[in-house]
């Protein structure tokens, strides 16, 4: 499993000028067919506890921030199987999360997302190896 998390300059394009953040990462674990992404060290940047994401077998993403559940997001299917549209939803009125999913020909699943926290845009990506796909695509 490969993970990446990086801050994004508000004036730059989303990926073009993103730089790595080495002291902030997230850990992915599986519990009862649920993928849980828990961010580490975000409290060093924001005076709040870490952010946690859940992705369950019903393809619903739940976002919790500072122990408050803001939004439940469900994937929007495209015309083809495993083809998804990006989704944008408000978080607490001012913050947003944007995310997309893709699966390649080797059944490698990639989750891309952006989170706006305290006026800073963060981007992340997680790649899940084929041996973990059974937890996702039931």
Over which residues does each language-model region extend?
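Surface-exposed, interaction-prone regions used to assemble/regulate multi-protein complexes
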Residues: 1-138
